[in-house]
Amino acid sequence: MDKNLFSSSGIWVRGNLHAHTKNSDGLLSPEEVIDYYFSRGYDFLAITDHEKVTTVKSEKLILLPGSEISVGKCLLGDSYHILAINVDNNEALQKYKNESVQALLDFVNKEKSFTIVAHPYWSKLTHSDLLNIEGYIGIEVYNGGCDIEVAKGFSMVHWDNLLTQGKSVYGLATDDAHYYGDLDSARGWINVKVKERSAEEILSSIKKGNFYSSSGPIIEYLSYNENKVEIRTSPVERVDFVSEGGRGFSVSLDTYNKVKQAKDKIRILGKVEITHERENEIAYVELGNSKITIKTERGGIISVVLEGFSFKKYFRAEITDHNGKKAWSNPILF
């Protein structure tokens, strides 16, 4: 991810990279799926029917050709599910379905396309399963269908294990939609920063990691330098900065309110100041050699600034709103 992603020029476009139609095991036709996402304000879509590329044209959405391929065996016996994006060679995909996972990844990369490992938790993928293959750009950190069906939609632990091992991969939120009607759809998406609305620009930005993922809340701004991290968001319940091992920082509204109520009794805290600015409440907290500034508005956290915090190998931001919906930045690597 570009460190200046949120301050650089460009526009944000919203899209889903995992959806199924009647051409595999979805309930809607390709045209109905396009209409569904268009009516909900999406800009682009990848239809990823199982083992095949669904070819369809539309003036409503930017369409990225793709497919979901089941291939190989993981250590626990199930297949990997690989999203191949910007691939339209059905014949070749059928061939590589019977090859190794690595052979499929290598083929897609030669086609100037990219791959994503779908729903690692749902697929029973271990850390070794993900560590021992190369060439995929990311994993589904959130899969809406796996979440609502069997409570196995989140894969943050898989992601952090890979990042800790030095494997540079992105986290993507998707739907994996089959049923629609807002049941397993419009649940996970990526917001991509582009210079213009085109398939080429969207694909290029995704490959560079110039996007963030969400199931609800908005990351309005994120910046990092050696001594300072700042994030601004829509009102949320919790803000996390995740790094290697026991490093990182987390603040929730519950923690925030307890600090306010007992600021003179919490021994690890230094100076604590609470001020008000129009509708905003601002808390300034000293914690050892570190400084924390938290701004709230209408019962939600809207910004956090950390100064003097030490991260190792990487850090990523994760926010959670009052409904439990999340958003994830891509990692900044050190």
Language-model features: locations:
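C-terminal functional module detector
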Residues: M1-S8, W12, E32, V169-Y170, ...
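A metal-dependent hydrolase metal-coordination microenvironment
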Residues: D2-A118, K124-G135, E140-N161, Q165, ...
